[in-house]
Amino acid sequence: MIRAEVDSANALGADDSFDQGMPVSFSLKQNYPNPFNPVTTIEFSLLQGGMTDISIYDISGRKVESLLGRRLVSGNHFIKYNASTLPSGMYFYSIVVSGMNGESLFSSTKKMVLMK
């Protein structure tokens, strides 16, 4: 079950740019607000398009959510995550971007805190 919303002019699950300028590098920004309850925003930039996976992990490293798993174009993107069914605690969100041939283009992980 996916409990994420990628804001878009397209259907739920599509991508949207939050800035018209093109990024100069790949990046995963800190979610905001942080701590959050229960919705937070995760922004990320893709220097080039690719298969983009974003997942949420608990403190023990167990994957608790897959937020995104689709090909996105280069640009600046954001996703809103609703963690209403998860207990309070520290979580990690991770992005992995792969190229056309499956090669790793970018990966990063950041910490977030859910406080209910």
PLM feature segments, named:
Residues 1-19:
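Short, compositionally biased serine/threonine- and acidic-rich segments at solvent-exposed termini, linkers
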Residues 1-4, 41, 111:
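Ordered hydrophobic segments in well-structured contexts
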Residues 66, 74, 80, 84, ...:
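C-terminal tail/sorting-segment detector
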Residues 15-32, 36-56, 73, 78-81, ...:
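Glycine-centered coil/turn sites that cap beta-strands in beta-rich domains
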